[in-house]
Amino acid sequence: MAINVNTNVSAMTAQRYLNGAADGMQKSMERLSSGYKINSARDDAAGLQISNRLTSQSRGLDMAVKNANDGISIAQTAEGAMNETTNILQRMRDLALQSSNGSNSSSERRAIQEEVSALNDELNRIAETTSFGGNKLLNGSFGSKSFQIGADSGEAVMLSMGSMRSDTQAMGGKSYRAQEGKAADWRVGAATDLTLSYTNKQGEAREVTINAKQGDDLEELATYINGQTEDVKASVGEDGKLQLFASSQKVNGDVTIGGGLGGEIGFDAGRNVTVADVNVSTVAGSQEAVSILDGALKAVDSQRASLGAFQNRFGHAISNLDNVNENVNASRSRIRDTDYARETTAMTKAQILQQASTSVLAQAKQSPSAALSLLG
């Protein structure tokens, strides 16, 4: 091997390997201290891009779970208030049945009506004060809101809540009353019919025909009607007037009353009535109140059922989101996180190579001194 002074190839080679070992040491220490094997694009450009997408997806899934939990909390808050609304309506129905009894005097019915009015006020107070995060839930202002339960756009679910105020039409229906009362001894003169035509809540046309026989009285007519349809309720007041009630939860629009008896009895045009109109100070009002409150209870039960389904759906959505998030994070970890067993091995190797390169470099730097011995 030639001996020269100007170019020390051995030292240059040792220096190159020393630099490589030092760079390996630096990378290993960076990965071990940060916990990530990809700390910059130069480490793995494709891996960095994929891991960043997975990070965005994971963060989106975390937020979707939070949104879903907020949705469940809103539904639970509303459903809890509706539970008390149901209790109040049940109490009002009990009072209406109590007032319908003939043993009550006028003053007793007025006392019952006072409690009914107080309960009506409490219904409205609950509807106006039930809120979540500043949003009123039961006074009709909530409407429909979307809840983002996915990591990407377009993955939203709508929640709708109507008004639970006592004066909302969904908590009532239409009332039809005979124009004139009939005497206690009134009877059907000859076999005839009474027809009720309407459209039910499902949009289906319905016609109920009541075939009355000679000698039937108003109470029997009411019994016939109630026996043939659940959509329209009939009762008779103390003034001898037949009255019909069609709940908004069962009938869309008006009920057309026809047939021979329909013309003979003569009904007024339907008027909108709600829980706010309940008046149990008369027998007729008490009878109608029972039908109104039954419709209101159905309206509340229907809304509560929707909220229950909403909560169950969101519960399953959260379980699925957690499962997806777990797998996304596992994938991201495999791509980006440091494998400490492998990296400590790599660092140990780099340390040994660095020490060896340093020793070799020191020896290589002594090679040019051999030229001095030749000159001496």
Swiss-Prot record:
Intracellular or extracellular location(s): Secreted; Bacterial flagellum
Gene3D superfamilies to which the protein is assigned, alphabetical: 3.30.70.2120, f41 fragment of flagellin, N-terminal domain, Flagellar export chaperone, C-terminal domain
Major subcellular location class: secreted
Record GO cellular component, one term: bacterial-type flagellum
One Pfam family linked to the record: Flagellin_N
UniProt-recorded name of the protein: Flagellin B
Family to which the UniProt record says this protein belongs: Belongs to the bacterial flagellin family.
Matching InterPro entries: Flagellin, Flagellin_C, Flagellin_C_sub2, Flagellin_hook_IN_motif, Flagellin_N
Disulphide bond pairs: none
Domain of life: Bacteria
The UniProt record lists the keyword DNA-binding: no
Coiled-coil stretches: 103-129
SUBUNIT field: Heteromer of multiple flagellin subunits including FlaA, FlaB, FlaC, FlaD and FlaE.
Entry keyword annotation includes Secreted: yes
Other information: V.cholerae is able to differentially regulate the flagellins within the flagellum maybe to produce flagella which are particularly suited for motility within a given environment.
Keywords, alphabetical: Bacterial flagellum, Coiled coil, Secreted
Function: Flagellin is the subunit protein which polymerizes to form the filaments of bacterial flagella. FlaB is not essential for flagellar synthesis and motility.
Gene designation per UniProt: flaB
GO molecular function per UniProt: structural molecule activity
Source organism of the structure: Vibrio cholerae serotype O1 (strain ATCC 39315 / El Tor Inaba N16961)
